[in-house]
Amino acid sequence: MTPLCPRPALCYHFLTSLLRSAMQNARGARQRAEAAVLSGPGPPLGRAAQHGIPRPLSSAGRLSQGCRGASTVGAAGWKGELPKAGGSPAPGPETPAISPSKRARPAEVGGMQLRFARLSEHATAPTRGSARAAGYDLYSAYDYTIPPMEKAVVKTDIQIALPSGCYGRVAPRSGLAAKHFIDVGAGVIDEDYRGNVGVVLFNFGKEKFEVKKGDRIAQLICERIFYPEIEEVQALDDTERGSGGFGSTGKN
């Protein structure tokens, strides 16, 4: 019987070398496949999954897309994108702007307006006769009759809030004084007074004077005032005039 290999020892070494080379080639192919999976997009769950190799994140682009998707779904209303490395934080949800007119404000104290409120339907708003008139005309809310050499408190049925730092001076109207001898008394309205404005009218004429509802009876002038502190001293500085009083500066 003729043997298959005339030299068995040589055949054994040849087959062993061939098998070792095949195993090395297979191992190298597997390593190259694993490296390709780690660096490339990677196959779907196939050979890599079968060998227990976890599928890696595909790329930075897909990572950013996933983050943006999560921010859209998980934080509805978030405006802006995720911050870049080394950049400032991304802005939070936008807050609607609040109009200055709707913000809480402290209560106004005074101001440059002369404010008024009507206390009845008989009241008339103060008016000025011209753009540069010094006073605001005040109107009677009711009918009155003032006998000669008598007086009456004429109600206007308005209350006023004077400009800050002012008091109200109630002055007579020139027409009533010149034609009917009607004068005004007690004509000071304090800045903090909030009652019904009443005007004291004096009739210095010889006939009774009729006041009708809606008649102009006086004028209100807003004048600046200073509120000094009171200080008591032992003696005051002397002046050239001294205590000279009535008529001390001349006869006419």
UniProtKB/Swiss-Prot annotation:
It comes from the Eukaryota. The modification Phosphoserine is found at S88, S99. Pathway: Pyrimidine metabolism; dUMP biosynthesis; dUMP from dCTP (dUTP route): step 2/2. Signal peptide: none annotated. The keyword Lipoprotein does not apply. The keyword 4Fe-4S does not apply. GO terms for cellular component: extracellular exosome; mitochondrion; nucleoplasm; nucleus. Its EC number is 3.6.1.23. Phosphorylation in mature T-cells occurs in a cell cycle-dependent manner. Isoform 3 is not phosphorylated. Found in a variety of tissues. Isoform 3 expression is constitutive, while isoform 2 expression correlates with the onset of DNA replication (at protein level). Isoform 2 degradation coincides with the cessation of nuclear DNA replication (at protein level). Gene3D superfamilies: 2.70.40.10. One of its GO terms (molecular function) is peroxisome proliferator activated receptor binding. Changing S99A: Loss of phosphorylation. Residues 1-69 form a transit peptide. Phosphorylation is necessary for activity. It is linked to Bone marrow failure and diabetes mellitus syndrome: A form of bone marrow failure syndrome, a heterogeneous group of life-threatening disorders characterized by hematopoietic defects in association with a range of variable extra-hematopoietic manifestations. BMFDMS is an autosomal recessive form characterized by various degrees of bone marrow failure, ranging from dyserythropoiesis to bone marrow aplasia, with onset in infancy or early childhood, and non-autoimmune insulin-dependent diabetes mellitus appearing in the first or second decades. PANTHER family: DEOXYURIDINE 5'-TRIPHOSPHATE NUCLEOTIDOHYDROLASE, DEOXYURIDINE 5'-TRIPHOSPHATE NUCLEOTIDOHYDROLASE, MITOCHONDRIAL. This is Deoxyuridine 5'-triphosphate nucleotidohydrolase, mitochondrial.
